[in-house]
Amino acid sequence: MPHPEHNTSVFLLSLGCSKNTVDSERLQAQAEASGITFTQQAEEAEVILINTCGFIEDAKEESIMEILAAVDMKNAGTVRQVYVMGCLTELYRNELQEELPEVDRFFGTRELPAVLDALGARYHQELYDHRSLLTPPHSSYLKIAEGCSRACSFCSIPKIRGRYLSQPMEQLLREARLLQENGVKELNLIAQDITVYGVDLYGKQMLNDLLMRLSDMEFRWIRLLYAYPVGFPLEVIDTIGNRSNICNYLDLPLQHCSDPILRSMNRGITKEQSLRLIEEIRNRNPDIRLRTTMIAGYPGETRKEFEEMLEFAGSVRFDRLGCFPYRHEEHSPAYSLIDTVPEEEKQERVSELMELQEEIARKKNEAFVGSLMTVLVDRPEEGEEGLILIGRTEFDAPEVDNECLLESGSPEPSPGTFVQARITGSTAYELHGTVESLME
């Protein structure tokens, strides 16, 4: 192991998505190898490092607010330096440097060695697959690709992150093995688009091959997130059904169902093709749970087209669904369109779709009452009637999906423990139950 070179203390604030989290984890592992220490409180650090998000306006505003708070601490003498990295810098480096001269350095999304150098550390090539987890130690992400080569009109990710670049399979397997050795039990595969994994490196889709190799390891749960619907390799659905440690779960963001909107979004798929894909997935694996996301209020979306989305969601009955109002982002291709739907109307459409989904989710969850389910305990929490355990089933991804609230038993299962739980009640987004037994 490399010897310590510096003992600077750093407070690392990682904002945005799970892909950003992985970047921050890699940075922290590299810095720690050079003797850098990381603190849990900004007040205890010499340096504040903020890994920003620049995807939508709300995320940009959060990033700016955190930068300003860090600058205030620097001006007050609480910290010595402030560094800013990530997606916001990638989009607005010149403007940020001009408006925030108090920030010592700005770094983009592909400048890890330069960030380390600024911290007084160096990049260790032999540690390229090491990470210091910022997630609970039993659950982690495996980022299988960088960037995106799709051209969805509402999205600025290709501009921020560059073209799609698959990570070599052997490298991913080594990284996964390290995560497993460090106690990770749930592995969540992520990328901007997992569907085309391998095409740029191997000339063909390799998601199924990677999934089977990972399944041969000793992870209890492996989960697939961010599957692009066009060209999704259906053999993956068969593998999910055949392998007990791959969750019966697929995150398949569709974004809309109306053909004119899908064309404008440049999604490369029609409503009918979406329906056929969903039908094929469910036919191949009736146990699978599907998650999707939708955008309401896209430029040109009429009330009729929104009602088409309502009807679509009502007939497909997704197991998990998130809906977001369209954001008119200046670095996305859709910025050239007129933002026709008023903000208030966008929010009303989001609420209307989510009310429909809430009723669907409530009925789906009611079907679990009385059953015995495997639950991964994430954390204890103080409830109104004492300590409860917060966990998830295989049908629920971290942070975005449902939770299972369990009465604390004796002995109390620790975070990262799998339990058999009897489901005694439900709401739209929660299951309630009791622990019947701990699992090996």
Curated annotation (Swiss-Prot):
PANTHER family in the record: RIBOSOMAL PROTEIN S12 METHYLTHIOTRANSFERASE RIMO, RIBOSOMAL PROTEIN US12 METHYLTHIOTRANSFERASE RIMO
Pfam families hit by this protein: Radical_SAM, TRAM_2, UPF0004
Major localization class: cytoplasm
InterPro entries in alphabetical order: Elp3/MiaA/NifB-like_rSAM (IPR006638), Methylthiotransferase (IPR005839), Methylthiotransferase_CS (IPR020612), Methylthiotransferase_N (IPR013848), Methylthiotransferase_N_sf (IPR038135), NA-bd_OB-fold (IPR012340), Ribosomal_uS12_MeSTrfase_RimO (IPR005840), rSAM (IPR007197)
Domain Radical SAM core: 134-363
Family: Belongs to the methylthiotransferase family. RimO subfamily.
GO biological process terms, semicolon-separated: tRNA modification
MTTase N-terminal domain boundaries: 8-124
Record function comment: Catalyzes the methylthiolation of an aspartic acid residue of ribosomal protein uS12.
Necessary cofactors: [4Fe-4S] cluster
NCBIfam families: 30S ribosomal protein S12 methylthiotransferase RimO, MiaB/RimO family radical SAM methylthiotransferase
Binding site for [4Fe-4S] cluster 1: 17, 53, 87
Protein name: Ribosomal protein uS12 methylthiotransferase RimO
Sequence ranges assigned to domain TRAM in this UniProt record: 366-437
Binding site for [4Fe-4S] cluster 2: 148, 152, 155
Entry's EC annotation: 2.8.4.4
One Gene Ontology MF term: 4 iron, 4 sulfur cluster binding
GO cellular component, one term: cytosol
The record's free-text note on cofactor binding: Binds 2 [4Fe-4S] clusters. One cluster is coordinated with 3 cysteines and an exchangeable S-adenosyl-L-methionine.
Domain of life: Bacteria
HAMAP family xrefs: MTTase_RimO
